[in-house]
């Protein structure tokens, strides 16, 4: 595990050296090495799956959330309403399946940026912005 962490930190440093301002990992708990590297090297990171902001609040700006509570609610509701098909279901912003949070971060995100983020989220929900998916 230590060797893997070292290679991941090396990758993060390489990405940072190439000019990235913010590094987003997509590996859940295995992103811990990236957060440690963010603290050691002073770059900004983003968490994923759950709110990871409190892990390193001075270095994690935001977290992308997979809202499993909402997913479970949708699944249970479909079973109760006898509409469950057993097929894969994709939940996104409009269904409450995913979201983003800055809660717990000490990095100040301006109200202007938060408003832009909300506007973009609404455009995704309305279909004005199409998010590609390998599942469809």
Where are these regions (language model features)?
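Single conserved hydrophobic/aromatic residue that forms the stacking wall/gate
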Residues: 1-10, 14-17
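Glycine-centered small-residue hotspots that permit tight backbone geometry or close packing
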Residues: 10-11, 31-34
């Amino acid at each position: 595990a230590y060797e893997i962490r070292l290679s991941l930190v090396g990758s993060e440093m390489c990405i940072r050296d190439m000019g990235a301002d913010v590094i987003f990992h997509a590996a859940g708990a295995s992103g811990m090495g990236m957060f440690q590297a963010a603290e050691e090297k002073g770059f900004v990171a983003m968490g994923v799956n759950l709110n990871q902001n409190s892990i390193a609040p001075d270095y994690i700006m935001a977290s992308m959330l997979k809202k499993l509570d909402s997913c479970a609610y949708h699944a249970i509701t479909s079973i109760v309403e006898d509409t469950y098909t057993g097929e894969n279901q994709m939940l996104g912003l409009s269904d409450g399946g995913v979201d983003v949070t800055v809660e717990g971060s000490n990095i100040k995100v301006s109200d202007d940026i938060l408003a832009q983020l909300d506007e973009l989220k609404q455009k995704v929900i309305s279909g004005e912005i199409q998010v590609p998916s390998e599942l469809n």
